[in-house]
From Swiss-Prot:
Gene that produces this protein: deoD
Binding site for phosphate: G20, R24, R43, R87, V88, G89, T90
Organism: Streptococcus pyogenes serotype M12 (strain MGAS2096)
Protein name: Purine nucleoside phosphorylase DeoD-type
Similarity section: Belongs to the PNP/UDP phosphorylase family.
NCBIfam families hit by this protein: deoD, PRK05819.1
CC annotations in GO: cytosol
Amino acid sequence: MSIHISAKKGDIADKILLPGDPLRAKFIAENFLEDAVCFNEVRNMFGYTGTYKGHRVSVMGTGMGMPSISIYARELIVDYGVKTLIRVGTAGAIDPEVHVRELVLAQAAATNSNIIRNDFPEFDFPQIADFGLLDKAYHIAREMGVTTHVGNVLSSDVFYTNMPERNMALGKLGVKAIEMEAAALYYLAAQHHVKALGIMTISDNLNDPTEDTTAEERQTTFTDMMKVGLETLIAND
């Protein structure tokens, strides 16, 4: 048992999906896993372990933002021995070529957060995905016929920014989307020598708000992302 997770040793698989929304974790467990057992309800941050196509996997919510995912991911890695972590979440498109319901695989994550600069104030430490996971996820998504973009994302500390033009300028530099967790997850993976990847479904298009999705759609309809994440988790077994 850790401070924020009530599971016992052995309750959590060594590979896990990490949606931000705990209700999305519940949805994944109920709709994709067999024999799913809930291992955590602390702070309503639901976590489950079950099997997917005969492979033992877990899924757990992380909440919103880098401080929150840093708490849960670190405890999963350090206290429970998780070796492979895939974030499955939503993002807002800033690249004009990226649209709602398409996937973005975060090859790297820029950030405006100080969560990494607290450790390395004198330079920018690049946050990158595990290439093996990235490669597998890309080919799995392509085989499924899912429109998928690979590239940089911005992990932001701010959802409601007062300077949206600064974020939009990044789209002109090839940054695909804005989200709030990947950079912290990648930094933890680098520290602890484990594998991590961010798979995002575009829920909002900052270039065209008419494409935006509802809260219910974000919770229950982004199943392509969930399938790609699960298939990627078991691809090494």
